């Protein structure tokens, strides 16, 4: 049980996909202007990452390895991600049309989010079992969502703050992201993996 807790804390805080591994920067910068949109994108990405991790592990373990088709791993995982994203898009469209309109083009872009593919590939490379794969996918998504929501809240505050003209817009957003990354580096001694 301790191993699973360490995996969760380590993935969310210490090895955060956005601030440490620099995966998923496109939605991090693009969807984080409003808190509601960032929360919606975080929830959708959490669902997709967790389900993709589970499906990718199952396909790799039950199909690719037994048939010696490991060279098709990346292609198979991209296909799994596309199917899961389409399923998520249908669910969001039916359950929350407002969120569907808010996310706009960013929902289909989860397919090309490198963090989702990165989670699937890292699960296999790290040799995780089924439960560890599911937890790793969920933890990576929670870390992604946490950082997105924090960044969106900060950006909303910066929108009304008195920022010098050269730093307005993306410049202050990048500086803020760098400061957040430095803050998350403080967690690096928390978990030794």
Swiss-Prot record:
Where's it found, cell-wise?
A: Cell inner membrane
The record gives the membrane topology as: Multi-pass membrane protein
Which residue windows are coiled coil? Answer: none
Q: Which InterPro entries match?
A: Ion_transpt_RnfA/RsxA, NqrDE/RnfAE, NqrDE/RnfAE_oxidrdctase
Known EC number: 7.-.-.-
* Functional description taken from the UniProt entry: Part of a membrane-bound complex that couples electron transfer with translocation of ions across the membrane. Required to maintain the reduced state of SoxR.
What name does UniProt use for this protein? Ion-translocating oxidoreductase complex subunit A
User: To which species is this protein native?
Assistant: Shigella flexneri
Name the gene for this chain: rsxA
């Amino acid at each position: 049980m301790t191993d699973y807790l360490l995996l969760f804390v380590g993935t969310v805080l210490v090895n955060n996909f956005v601030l440490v591994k620099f995966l998923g920067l496109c939605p991090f910068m693009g969807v984080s202007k409003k808190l509601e949109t960032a929360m919606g994108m975080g929830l959708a990405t959490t669902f997709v990452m967790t389900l993709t991790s589970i499906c990718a592990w199952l396909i790799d373990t039950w199909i690719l390895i037994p048939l010696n088709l490991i060279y098709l791993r990346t292609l198979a995982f991209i296909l799994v991600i596309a199917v899961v994203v389409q399923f998520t898009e249908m669910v969001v469209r039916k359950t929350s049309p407002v969120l569907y309109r808010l996310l706009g083009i960013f929902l289909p872009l989860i397919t090309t989010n490198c963090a989702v593919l990165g989670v699937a590939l890292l699960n296999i490379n790290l040799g995780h079992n089924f439960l560890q794969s599911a937890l790793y996918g969920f933890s990576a998504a929670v870390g992604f969502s946490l950082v997105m929501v924090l960044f969106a809240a900060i950006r909303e505050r910066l929108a009304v703050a008195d920022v010098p003209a050269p730093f307005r817009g993306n410049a202050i957003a990048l500086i803020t992201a760098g400061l957040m990354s430095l803050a998350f580096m403080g967690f690096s001694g928390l978990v030794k993996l």
